[in-house]
Swiss-Prot record:
Cited SUPFAM superfamilies: Ankyrin repeat
Residues carrying N-acetylmethionine: 1
InterPro entries: Ankyrin_rpt, Ankyrin_rpt-contain_sf, RAI14/UACA, T_SNARE_dom
Tissue: Highly expressed in skeletal muscle, heart, kidney and pancreas. Expressed in choroid, retina and epidermal melanocytes. Expressed in eye muscles and thyroid follicular cells.
One annotated GO biological process: negative regulation of inflammatory response
Induction annotation: Up-regulated after TSH stimulation.
Coiled-coil region: 286-374, 438-1386
Origin species: Homo sapiens (Human)
Descriptive protein name: Uveal autoantigen with coiled-coil domains and ankyrin repeats
């Protein structure tokens, strides 16, 4: 609804320029699916979706669609601040305009979204941009009655007196829209009160014309000129008279009187002053000097008091205005929502009215058809009386006239106010009803009115009870709303407390930053003092240390950023997969529901068809009884001929049926072969179970993938730590610094993850295609069912039209005879095709001729006349009925025969196609086994080569581990030596700190060991699970292999298998290449590590020689060595045990991988197997259903043929008995026949009367049901509307609670991040203290040895440059910090000015997001 309103608003705007249209068309041409998704997400306000789509390449949120609007414009017009933040962070041209020339600032000002406007102004959006009407954003804000947006625009330099195309300023538009507060605000900001448009009209004139009293009053108070004239010579009083507003006229009169009095006083003033001056000069000169001083002091005091009061009042007014603006925005949004709901209600009402009209029209047509049906039945059953026909014609005509009159009359008129002709339409046409007097009619009407009033009273009581119930519910809802408000107030208080805590932490962080500054200044002074007496070598070492620290920090930050990006990408991919799975599940459920609905509808339609067939049979029986007596003999001979001919046809049909059965048997055999191939088809229940298991497995695999990714990340981190340790060793050795900078670790885990995710996406796409195919097949089945329903309805209507009165019966008989002739021609054509069965047909024709000769005798024996009379009558009636049934069945059989032929032809074609495919696409088992054996040999060779490479790789890894262990041992020995040096030359405090650090490292190592043991237990459990799953898969694969050995293999499967194997071989080759590369890399690393080890040993020896020269105490060194060696040995033993466990796990994993690969090579993938299974199951089900239907039809036909044969034999026996006996005259026979027919006609008349009475009773019952249903529908609509309102209110409450919980969660996260930042600051302070200690130690060394002055000057220069760079970094950090604090304070001030509304919550969310970004 909102999108429709926005479109209508755009259509109301005057036509844009050609350039805007051309741009829109150009952008619309480039519009793609991502732009459409982005537009839908922006309209829904889905921030996550918007950010995910913006992350893709080539997405531009400023692109215009066909309607000339962009995503950026939609977000700003709806006031969605989070989406707008996402778009602005992504990057967009802020000055982009739509087809009306409006940019985002115009739209934010037009719809009163002050926060969006503030955000756009922060991104330097121009305020002077004008649309095609020449209006700026200030014009739109003045029209939208949004004072906060006007204040923001004016603060950012928007021109208050800007004019549009018509020359109107924002003040003119505000007065025209009757916005007095905005008029006052604009005047305070410097708006010209007397500015004129192109017709020289002022704001006062337009306010008088449109009757805006408050705005006119504000203008007059602020000095608007009343006497100005426009281009036509009219003043403001003329416009006030046009507006017919007496209050404005009185205001103008008072203002004009005040101005006239002032002018008169100004004119008279000089003469009076001259007179007074002449008389009073002497008196005033003495006292003036005394009083002036006191008056000036008093006035100054009063001015200061008034100024303070004015300031307070202005502040209070601003606060109140902000509150009022917030409330107005909320009211506007609620009004929009209410308007949308009302429009939707009106649409639903209109739809309900249209459906009720359609229902009434259908009921009327049903009643008319029933009347016609009665009319036709009376024509058939009656003996041709004209009176009854005319009477029913009159009834039908009067019913139609009554329907037309009821449609013409208005629904508002009650039933008792209508005319008697409307209430009693038959009263005018029937002269037999004149006996009723008018008094009796009036009494009946009064009784009807009383019943109507009583029903109305009952309805009124029911409605009152329902209203009371709803009032109670509303009260309960009001109580709940109050409770929710109280809860929200408490949560708001908690949020305010949290804000205060955040402020405190910000201040503490500022203090820590200041401490850092002081530390750096102290360092600077210390360095400058030591530079005067320092060494060149020491300065170089300090430089190296600083560079190393910078490199470490930069590398760590880059690696952390990479890891974060990888984690975010993985989370996005997992979320997308979850959404896709949910969508697929929902689509599956929806399709299952549609299937159940279709089956229900099919069953209902089948029941209706059976009922209609029963009715048709009853009507055919009635028609069979309504044949006249005179034409019985002619019909007898013709029917006997037809019976004989149909017997022949039945014989031919039986032969054709046998042929079709033989073909069906062949098809069954082929189907059995196909079934043998697909013996393992699954039932739908089992399929669902398997599907659920697979979904569980997929979920478990997803979890395993996430765990593996975490393990990979941990391994990467450990590798990175090892390389960092190597770098530290290189820095100490001074020789390998340049070489280690060029070596980096390759990150290939992301590529493997991408490949796995691509495979999963392909599987999901295949599933989607299968679901869509099923959906299309179900749609086709639905269309077929609808066509069958239409054909059945047409057959029913055809049967209704077939029952014709006896006058037209002869014509129909002639038409039937012509049809019979045509059928004979068709049968003659079929006879030509069936030449083999002519002998049996000739025998049957000879027998029929003999029967005809025997029936030609016109006399019956006397003795058995009375006994045979009843039997003949019964048999004749039965034969007539059965013949009619046989006619219908014969026609149905012909149609079905044609259909069966078509199906047989289709099946033959399919068989031929399948045979051709089998010849072209099938391979013998020998060839397939030869190919499989060759492939298995190649796979074994590849696996053997892989095993060798893996063995080499493991050996290389073991050697690397040993080298790492040796490097660690050497490193620890160097650490012990350094600690000894520090103990000798440094104080005891540093030695204690080292011991503490060593204990902390021991604790960390123990924790890591415990974590690794836990991981090992988890991995063992996973291995067990994998073994169980592999056992299950093995069993399934063995069963599949047993089934596949007995069956032929399709070329498609073999091709697919070959492709899969080729792919796998390619993948294995790639893995071989990768492993070989890794092996070479490992060798290179090994050689480098050996070289490093040699160099480090040489360095250690050099250090030991130095230590020997310098007398070190051996007791401390030996104690430290013992303690360190003990801990190192323990750690080595634990590491070795862990490595052994890890190698065992790797061996088990490789074995499992090999088993899986063998199973994959020897089996078909499950997805393909399931797809083929489903396709064959569908085909088999369809063929089974068709075969069952054909078998049932053939059984019915065989039963009918057997019945006919038994009847023919009975007739033959009766004829033989008649020949042996004597013959009686036909006159008696005819007399008895006429008596029986008269009895039958009388019974038919009675039946017709009973049917009429039954139908009248049914009509009365239907009318009563319709009234009850209409009353129930109205009640249900009321209930539904009230429940919807209740649900909407509950949803709003839930949304507010969710936003509050999100705020709490984000505040907690920000607190955690602030703590992390504090920890980092403390770590930096510790590093600074360590540097100080190192410098102090070096300063002692520098005092012993002296150097020349040139080196000292160079050292001083370099140190000064370093200090300057550090100062610049500190200044930049301070600036960023102060900018953040400024933004934070502005948001806090906006929160402190009013309550915690939605806007303030959004601002707090923005602050928390910025804090997160700064911490990161």
């Amino acid at each position: 609804m909102k999108s429709l309103k926005s479109r209508l608003r755009r259509q109301d705007v005057p036509g844009p320029a050609s350039s805007g249209a051309a741009a829109a068309s150009a952008h619309a041409a480039d519009w793609n699916k991502y732009d459409d998704r982005l537009m839908k997400a922006a309209e829904r306000g889905d921030v996550e979706k918007v950010t995910s789509i913006l992350a893709k390449k080539g997405v531009n949120p400023g692109k215009l669609d066909v309607e000339g609007r962009s995503v950026f414009h939609v977000v700003t017009s709806k006031g969605n601040l989070e989406c707008l933040n996402a778009i602005l962070i992504h990057g967009v041209d802020i000055t982009t305009s739509d087809t009306a020339g409006r940019n985002a600032l115009h739209l934010a000002a037009k719809y009163g979204h002050a926060l969006c406007l503030q955000k756009l102004l922060q991104y330097n959006c121009p305020t002077e941009h004008a649309d095609l009407q020449g209006r700026t954003a200030l014009h739109d804000a003045a029209m939208a009655d949004c004072p906060s947006s006007i204040q923001l625009l004016c603060d950012h330099g928007a021109s208050v007196n800007a004019k549009d195309v018509d020359g109107r300023t924002p003040l003119v538009l505000a007065t025209q829209m009757s916005r007095p507060t905005i008029c006052q605000l604009l005047i305070d900001r410097g708006a010209d009160v007397n500015s004129r448009d192109k017709q020289n009209r002022t704001a006062l004139m337009l306010g008088c014309e449109y009757g805006c009293r408050d705005a006119v009053e504000v203008l007059i108070k602020n000095g608007a000129d009343i006497s100005l004239l426009d281009a036509l010579g009219h003043d403001s009083s003329y416009y006030a008279r046009i507006g017919d507003n007496l209050d404005i006229l009185t205001l103008l009169k008072t203002a004009s009187e005040n101005t006239n009095k002032g002018r008169e006083l100004w004119k008279k003033g000089p003469s009076l002053q001259q007179r007074n001056l002449t008389h009073m000069q002497d008196e005033v000169n003495v006292k003036s000097h005394q009083r002036e001083h006191q008056n000036i002091q008093d006035l100054e005091i009063e001015n200061e008091d008034l100024k303070e009061r004015l300031r307070k009042i202005q502040q209070e007014q601003r606060i109140l205005l902000d509150k009022v603006n917030g409330l107005q925005l909320q009211l506007n949004e609620e009004v929009m929502v209410a308007d949308d709901l009302e429009s939707e209600r009106e649409k639903l009402k209109s739809l309900l009215a249209a459906k009720e009209k359609q229902h009434e029209e259908s009921l009327r047509t049903i009643e008319a058809l029933k009347n016609r049906f009665k009319y036709f039945e009376s024509d058939h059953l009656g003996s041709g009386s004209h009176f009854s026909n005319r009477k029913e014609d009159m009834l039908l005509k009067q019913g139609q006239m009554y329907m037309a009159d009821s449609q013409c009359t208005s629904p508002g008129i009650p039933a008792h106010m209508q005319s008697r002709s409307m209430l009693r339409p038959l009263e005018l046409s029937l002269p037999s009803q004149t006996s009723y007097s008018e008094n009796e009619i009036l009494k009946k009407e009064l009784e009807a009115m009383r019943t109507f009033c009583e029903s109305a009273k009952q309805d009124r009581l029911k409605l009152q009870n329902e209203l009371a119930h709803k009032v109670a519910e509303c009260k309960a809802l009001a109580l709940e709303c109050e409770r929710v408000k109280e809860d929200s107030d408490e949560q708001i208080k908690q949020l305010e407390d949290a804000l205060k805590d955040v402020q405190k932490r910000m201040y503490e962080s500022e203090g820590k930053v200041k401490q850092m500054q002081t530390h750096f200044l102290a360092l600077k002074e210390h360095l400058t003092s030591e530079a005067a007496s320092g060494n060149h070598r020491l300065t170089e070492e300090l430089k190296d240390q600083l560079k190393d620290l910078k490199v470490k920090y930069e590398g760590a930050s880059a690696e952390v950023g990479k890891l974060r990006n990888q984690i975010k990408q993985n989370e996005m991919i997992v979320e997308e997969f979850k959404r896709d799975e949910g969508k697929l599940i929902e689509e599956n459920k929806r399709l299952q529901k549609e299937l159940s609905m279709c089956e229900m509808e099919r069953e209902k339609k089948g029941r209706k068809v059976t009922e209609m067939e029963g009715q048709a049979k009853e009507l055919s029986a009635k028609l069979a009884l309504s044949i006249p007596a005179e034409k019985f003999e002619n019909m007898k001979s013709s029917l006997s001929n037809e019976v004989n001919e149909k017997a022949k046809k039945l014989v031919e049909m039986e032969r054709e049926h046998e042929k079709s059965l033989s073909e069906i048997r062949q098809l069954k055999r082929e189907l059995e072969n196909v079934k043998a191939k697909l013996a393992q088809h699954v039932k739908p229940e089992e399929h669902e179970q398997v599907k659920s298991r697979l979904e569980q497995k997929s979920g478990e695999l997803g979890k395993k993938i996430t765990e593996l990714t975490l393990k990979n990340q941990t391994l990467q981190k450990e590798i990175e730590k090892v390389y960092l340790d190597n770098k530290l060793l290189k820095e100490q050795a001074h020789n390998l610094t340049i070489e280690m900078k060029n070596h980096y670790v390759p990150l290939k885990v992301s590529e493997d993850m991408k490949k796995s995710h691509d495979a999963i996406i392909d599987d999901l796409n295949r599933k989607l295609l299968d679901v869509t195919q099923k959906y299309t097949e179900k749609k086709l089945e639905m269309e077929k069912l609808l066509l069958e329903n239409d054909s059945l309805s047409k057959d029913v209507s055809r049967l209704e039209t077939v029952f014709v009165p006896p006058e037209k019966h002869e014509k129909e008989i002639i038409a039937l005879k012509s049809n019979i002739v045509e059928l004979k021609k068709q049968l003659s054509e079929l006879k030509k095709k069936c030449g083999e069965d002519q002998e049996k047909i000739h025998a049957l024709t000879s027998e029929n001729t003999n029967l005809k000769k025997m029936m030609s005798n016109q006399y019956v024996p006397v003795k058995t006349h009375e006994e045979v009379k009843m039997t003949l009558n019964d048999t004749l009636a039965k034969t007539n009925r059965e013949l009619l049934d046989v006619k219908k069945k014969f026609e149905d059989i012909n149609q079905e025969f044609v259909k069966i032929k078509d199906k047989n032809e289709i099946l033959k074609r399919n068989l031929e196609n399948t045979q051709n495919q089998i010849k072209a696409e099938y391979i013998s088992l020998a060839e397939h086994e030869a190919k499989m054996s060759s492939l298995s040999q190649s796979m074994r060779k590849v696996q053997d080569s892989n095993a060798e490479i893996l063995a080499n790789y493991r050996k290389g890894q073991e050697e690397i581990v040993t080298l790492h262990a040796e490097i660690k041992a050497q490193k620890k020995e160097l650490d012990t030596i350094q600690e000894c040096i520090k103990v000798k030359y440094a104080p005891i405090v540093s030695f204690e700190e080292c011991e503490r650090k060593f204990k902390a490292t021991e604790k960390e190592l123990k924790d890591q060991l415990s974590e690794q043991t836990q991981k090992y237990s988890v991995s063992e459990e996973e291995v067990k699970k994998n073994k169980q799953e592999n056992d299950k898969l093995k069993k399934e694969i063995f069963t599949l292999q047993k089934d596949l050995r007995d069956k032929t293999v399709l070329i498609e499967k073999s091709h697919e298998m070959e492709r899969a194997l080729s792919r796998k071989t390619d993948e294995l080759n790639k893995q071989l290449k990768d492993l070989s590369q890794k092996y070479t890399e490992v060798k290179n690393v090994k050689e480098k590590l050996v070289e490093e080890n040699a160099k480090q040993t040489s360095e250690i020896l050099a250090v030991q020689n130095l230590l020997q020269k310098q007398h070190v105490p051996l007791e401390q060194v030996e104690a430290l060595k013992k303690s360190l060696n003990g801990t190192i040995e323990n750690l080595k033993e634990e590491l070795k045990s862990m490595q052994r466990c890890y190698e065992k796990e790797q061996q088990t994993v490789t074995k499992l991988h090999q088993l899986l690969e063998n199973q994959k090579n020897s089996s078909v993938p499950l997805a393909e197997h399931l797809q083929i299974k489903e396709a064959f199951e569908k085909e088999v089900g369809i063929i089974k259903a068709s075969l069952r239907e054909k078998e049932e039809e053939s059984q019915n036909k065989m039963e009918e043929v057997s019945k006919l044969q038994s009847e023919v034999q009975n007739t033959k026996q009766a004829l033989k008995k008649l020949e042996t006996r004597e013959v009686v005259d036909l006159s008696k026979y005819k007399a008895t026949k006429s008596d029986l027919e008269t009895q039958i006609s009388s019974l038919n008349e009675k039946l017709a009367n009973l049917n009429r009475k039954y139908e009248e009773v049914c009509e009365e019952v239907l009318h009563a049901k319709k009234k009850e249903i209409s009353a129930k529908d109205e009640k249900e609509l009321l209930h539904f509307s009230i429940e919807q309102e209740i649900k909407d209110q509950k949803e709003r409450c839930d949304k507010s609670l969710t936003t509050i919980t999100e705020l709490q969660r984000r505040i907690q996260e920000s607190a955690k991040q602030i703590e992390a930042k504090d920890n980092k600051i403390t770590e930096l302070l510790n590093d600074v203290e360590r540097l100080k200690q190192a410098l102090n130690g070096l300063s002692q060394l520098t005092y012993t040895s002296g150097n020349p002055t040139k080196r000292q000057s160079q050292l001083i220069d370099t140190l000064q440059h370093q200090v300057k760079s550090l100062e610049q970094q500190l200044a930049d950090a301070d600036r960023q910090h102060q900018e953040v604090i400024a933004i934070y304070r502005t948001h806090l001030l906006s929160a402190a000015q009013g309550h915690m509304d939605e806007d303030v919550q959004e601002a707090l969310l923005q602050i928390i997001q910025m804090r997160q970004g700064l911490v990161c």
